[in-house]
Curated annotation (Swiss-Prot):
Gene: Gcna
Keywords, in A-Z order: Chromosome, Nucleus
Biased composition (Low complexity): 1-51
Protein name: Germ cell nuclear acidic protein
Biased composition, class Basic and acidic residues, residue ranges: 122-141, 179-354, 431-449
Organism: Mus musculus (Mouse)
Domain notes: SUMO interaction motif 1 (SIM) mediates the binding to polysumoylated substrates.
Length: 507
């Protein structure tokens, strides 16, 4: 299609075919002027000879007379050259056609592929011109009384690029409307409207069809490269986000240190110019994976999985751990909205805050574990539990806002809640858990088990059914079951140890 379009578009730049209505002498003069003017492009003479070789049968095909477009209907500003005499060109009646069957007719149509150079392209373009004869014959044949050039009326066929080189300075304004009228349907049929629109002004300004062929190629190349670059960026961004979510799951399942997940999130948040909402989702997911990996390390070191739930709440609620350790409701209520406000516009800054506060929360949990039992009373436990419920509601609202992006998180937390539902009746039967410093998070876990069954109704509603959650679902389910068993065992061990310590402290 490119060869056809370039051939039709470049025909007038290289050749000004002119058939005159009066005898062979004037036609030979006009054809010599057309050939001399078309010799500005390097290979036009060779193409004229090749056109004689390859297409001597064109005059036979052109039995139909040319459809003539009146020059008044097309040209606006060349009022002096509007001789609206109508020339019908039929291939057998003129002496010029008999004298020069190949050379005279063919510059009208065939010498339009000079600038591309290679004869193979010429052959293909001339062959592609043969089925286009019906299109080309319907081009406007303007009969201009060109008194400045010859005393006879010269009929010139205007092609896509506009003016022929013979009278390019005079006739460019006439060539433009016709070329726009004709070039647009042809080039649209060939699928290159924008390249033709860009190529036209260039070729009219330069008088070269070469520039239009280059313009087409350049615009196509630019469009392809831009679309490829955008597509690559989008696919990379999507692949990164998916691989990041999968990487989170893997790091959580393996219990690797938080640094890997943190590196993934940071590089992705910096490398992706996608959106702040995605950044916020990343910070939430990152905080979750951090706290989970951290929680696993703590369960291995201390045998307690409650610190993991506390770590999640630390990273996402920012300031709740301190208030939990100290029992301050006001700072906690302030910390949560601040974190929510900061997390949206500044995911990077929120990430740093989450890391620092997570570290502070660890230190405080350790300090709280070392504290004697008498400091933590049942009232403080109730306050903390109420605060945790409030934080859970806020987090759920936030998640529902971005549920389309972080669609695997609610499923992950729902599965995380399932084993806790089985283990939480033991917490209710255990009277010492409220006051035990090591089991600070047990009342929160009870709050978790009370909250989470309401999650499926709220979280599954906004999720569209066609989201790519299905591959993550299997991974999350297997990982949730495995982690749930490990967490149950860890909590049992931690509780046993906590009871021992609590009994000693009580004594």
């Amino acid at each position: 299609m490119d060869s056809g379009s370039s051939s039709s578009s470049s025909s007038s730049g290289s050749s000004s075919g002119s058939c005159s209505t009066s005898g062979s002498g004037s036609t030979s003069g006009s054809s010599t002027t057309s050939s001399s003017s078309s010799s500005s492009s390097s290979s036009s003479s060779s193409s004229s000879s090749s056109s004689k070789e390859y297409m001597p049968e064109l005059p036979k095909q052109r039995k139909a007379s040319c459809v003539v477009i009146d020059s008044e209907s097309d040209s606006d500003n060349t009022s002096d050259e509007k001789n609206t005499t109508v020339c019908e060109i039929s291939s057998g009646d003129e002496t010029s056609d008999i004298d020069r069957p190949g050379g005279q007719k063919l510059p009208l149509i065939v010498i339009d592929d000079d600038d591309d150079g290679s004869p193979d392209l010429k052959n293909t373009k001339q062959k592609s011109d043969e089925p286009q004869m019906s299109v080309l014959e319907k081009e406007g044949v303007e009969c201009i009384g060109s008194d400045s050039t010859s005393p006879h009326d010269v009929c010139e066929i205007w092609d896509v690029c506009g003016s022929s080189n013979q009278t390019s300075s005079e006739l460019e304004p006439e060539g433009e409307p016709e070329s726009e009228a004709k070039g647009e349907p042809e080039s649209e049929a060939k699928g290159e409207p924008e390249s033709e629109a860009k190529g036209e002004p260039e070729s009219e300004a330069k008088g070269e069809s070469e520039s239009e062929a280059k313009g087409e190629m350049e615009t196509e190349a630019k469009g392809e490269s831009e679309s490829e670059a955008k597509g690559e960026m989008e696919t990379e961004a999507k692949g990164e986000s998916e691989s990041e979510a999968k990487g989170e799951m893997e790091t959580e399942a393996k219990g690797e240190p938080e640094s890997e997940a943190k590196g993934e999130m940071e590089t992705e948040a910096k490398g992706e110019p996608e959106s702040e909402a995605k950044g916020e989702m990343e910070t939430e997911a990152k905080g979750e994976s951090e706290s989970e990996a951290k929680g696993e390390m703590e369960t291995e070191a201390k045998g307690e999985s409650e610190s993991e739930a506390k770590g999640e709440m630390e990273t996402e609620a920012k300031g709740e751990p301190e208030s939990e350790a100290k029992g301050e409701m006001e700072t906690e209520a302030k910390g949560e909205p601040e974190s929510e406000a900061k997390g949206e516009p500044e995911p990077e800054a929120a990430k740093g805050e989450m890391e620092t506060e997570a570290a502070m929360g660890e230190v405080e949990t350790e300090a709280a574990m070392g504290e004697p039992e008498q400091e933590i009373t049942a009232e403080e436990a109730k306050k903390k539990r109420a605060a945790y419920l409030l934080a859970q509601q806020r987090k759920r609202k936030r998640k529902n806002r971005f549920i389309c992006m972080s669609s695997s998180k609610p499923r992950r937390k729902r599965r995380r809640a399932d084993p806790q539902d089985g283990a939480d009746p033991q917490d209710g039967a255990d009277p010492q858990d409220r006051a035990d410093p090591q089991d600070l998070a047990d009342p929160q876990d009870r709050g978790d088990s009370q909250d989470m069954p309401s999650l499926p109704g709220t979280s599954d509603e906004p999720i569209p059914s066609g989201q790519p959650v299905c591959p993550r679902k299997g991974m999350a389910s297997s990982r949730g079951r495995g982690r749930g068993r490990g967490r149950g065992r860890g909590r049992g061990r931690g509780r046993g140890r906590g009871r021992g310590r609590g009994a000693k402290a009580g004594k």
